[in-house]
Amino acid sequence: ALPAAQLTGTLPAISGANLTGITADDNTPAFMAVPHVDGDYIANTTWEKVLWTTEVYDTDGKFASSTFTPTVAGKYHFTCQIMWEQIDDRTNNHIALYKNGSEYHRVMFYSVNPDGGGGGPISSASLDVTAISDTDDYFEIYVNESSGARHVRGTTHSTGSYFSAFKLAGA
């Protein structure tokens, strides 16, 4: 593989012409964060910001106080998984990506236990979306559930909740 530094300027094309405009763009800024070990309790029917207290990585220092502020214009891909503990049967649960304090994209899952009992000790939902960001935009994750206060799983479990994003190279 060629180092990125060697992919700038003009390169010869097969036709004999020169290729120009080739850049070594990458997928940064990027981050991944998880909740603290004990997670957080989410109140019934209230939209609450998830507190992401542990950074797994943060390539450019753009994630702080549970908020991603890329400061680099472009398209970003966001991924979030929320693991709820003790969700009741037949419950609406939501994850929303907020952009600049307003809902940008929401996903919902409906918890149903085929045995007819409670929804079980663990339920999960995932959000995947691409968003355009200007230099001053910021992004956060909010959740809502309709069955009473529920616990968002933290980092004590290998399959817990997480929030991540990265810039799409060239976008």
Predicted regions and their residues:
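Short beta-strand-plus-loop segments that form exposed binding edges in beta-rich domains
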Residues: Y142-G148
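Terminal (often C-terminal
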Residues: G21-T91, I95, K99, V107-D115, ...
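Short, surface-exposed tryptophan/glycine-enriched loops
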Residues: G117-Y138
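Short, conserved beta-strand segments of beta-strand-rich sandwich/propeller modules, principally
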Residues: H77, Y138-E140
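Short intrinsically disordered, low-complexity segments
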Residues: A5-T8, V37, D137
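Fibrous stalk/shaft segments of extracellular and virion attachment machinery
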Residues: A1-T28
